Amino acid sequence: MVCAPKQLELAKRPQNLPAINRLFAPWSYFIDTTYAVGPRECHDPNHPIGRNDDIMWKIRLSDYARDIFGIFGSECGREWALPHSDFFEGLVAVSGRYYHNLKPDEFGATVIPFFEMVYHDCQICYGKYGYSADKAAEFVAHHVLCARPLYYHSFPDHLYWKSTGKREKQQTPVPDVACYTRSDNGWADGVHPLDVFIKNTYEVLGPLHSVTAHDTLSNLKFLTEDFTLRQATYGRSKDATTVIVNFGTKDAQVESTLGGKVTLPPWGFVIEGPRFAAFHARRWNGQDYGTGALFTLRPMNKKDLKDADRIRIFHAFGPETIKWKGNLYKVQREMVIRVL
């Protein structure tokens, strides 16, 4: 590591950040490791610094990058960095797990979205490092509970989407850890599994983060004694968005305002808020979905879902029929419905 005063000095060189801005004019910039490395001391007699000095210089580097590019973030994240950055990379998850090699079950622990209780409304957070989309069900479920956008790290070589050969899963594990690569009867049917995964997760996590980005986690509940069925509420009163996620290995039964009696498969969820609703469920609003279906609903104007006369419905996989306000709609990919 270069000591902090020299980091800023190097960043200001004409051929460094100023050149990047001149050549490419990015609106956002990421500097690796700045926040990942804790406060350091430097005993060089020419520029000795203590831990607080190290933080001060890293803040100056952050502010400098932010002034140039507009949006700035760094790896991991620090509380002192919150006023000086816009996003943290690595706080939500690491390599498809909760945190590096940490295994919560070995400690008898349950991971909860604690950061979201305090700072969800003032910092965008992502995970980091590669993971396998066909093993990412719990990873996605964790992002749903945290109401955070997903990142996409590992891509096959070359024109991977043109690859031929059988793409069906040879065997479906129980629970289905590859469930978010499903596309049967849905929007991405026949598309490469990675692209299916990107589309499915983006359609859920993108809008979910959009409607909760300025809210904190106001309530967290464990709905079962084994802590596997979890409910998170973002915001308060009529503007709140509620998320219920099943982290268990068996189906879970829940009640929701829009869906009534809902059956969630392992890693399934139901999301309900004034501006967005979604579910990965085996039963929702009186409709049975066999091995599960994934739908999202968004109003097409500034009205809330309950008052909207035009609603976009996205269908990722599973049976194609959804019931809304007493009417049945068959949605293979996506559709804007008119509600009378």
What is the predicted role of each segment?
Residues V2-R338:
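Active-site-proximal substrate-binding groove within the catalytic cores of carbohydrate-active enzymes
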